[in-house]
């Protein structure tokens, strides 16, 4: 039986990028970078803990690193700490292990330094509205809303018939869908920073329509359904904090300034 509320799978594996190491940071990975005196991961997990729509929280990270960083606070931040796999999708599979197939899960990056409980609840309300029966609900944010608040934040923008968008750092998945489509997810993850190459994975005609900005959200959803055998929907959620992530040293400096 699914548990009440959304289960969170927060991904905090991997190693620290050279950009941060060159600046003298020694954190295990960017999730553990300090922001205002606390690891960024703590800010993210506290946001999930404060969200009304969230039940259980799982964090996929090295258990020893998590225990060393948080000590007695660890149990308050996460219900389960799970060792990561060899890559993004393997880590997702580890985080989903043992969940009921129909459990609704929020998969989240852990470099969303501006994440708040209310932004999470807005996303889940939107997912409940437009992707209630979906297996996968991909979060995305429109550029005009994002740039109105954070005009200097860089993103990979995708031009569609309905507007210009970037991906959010949170998406919704039904737990049973991950194992069913793991191979496809690996291919998508490898291309996620290159929208046109990702479009070619969908089909040459999709690539052409993406190139000209004429592809529609509904046709991308339909093609994703065909490729995966699942029900895939886009979850447009105009909360820009869901898309502000810390990829580079400049991003870290920016969010430190915003949170000052």
Identify the function of each model-found stretch:
Residues 248:
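Short, conserved phosphate/pyrophosphate- and ester-handling motifs at nucleotide-, phospho-/glycolipid
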Residues 115-226, 237-241:
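Conserved core of the sugar-phosphate nucleotidyltransferase
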Residues 1-26:
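N-terminal nucleotide-binding beta1-loop-alpha1 segment
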Residues 12, 61-63, 109, 140:
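Short beta-strand/turn micro-motifs composed of small residues
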